[in-house]
C-alpha cells in the first residue's frame, strides 16, 4: 500500500500530464474539429446554504453546446466504494449546472490510468479515456 504522500504526488503528476495533453484528449474524444474552450471550475463550500465544495480540473466547453466535465484520477476507489463515488460525481455535475445556469449538455468524462470494465462504470459516465490514450 502506497503512502498518502506518494498517492497525492501520483495523482498530481497524472493531472499535470493530462493537462499537458489536452489536444490529444480532444482528439480521442472525437472533438478535435470542434472549437473548444479549455478551463477548470470550482465552487467553495457554503455551509450556510448547505453547499459542498465542488471542482473539475478540466472542463472542455464545446462550440456545439456540449460541455465535458473531466474527472482526472490516477486510480479510483475500490469497487465497493464506486457507487458512492459515482453519486458524488453526479452531485458535482449538478452543482456545475446550478452554478453556471448552463443549458448545454453536460458529459461526465473519466480519465484514469487504467480502463474500467463497462460493468464497473456508472451509466452517467459518457466517455472514458486512459493513460494509453494520451500517447
Predicted regions and their residues:
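A cross-kingdom feature that marks ATP-driven nucleic-acid transaction machinery
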Residues: 1-135
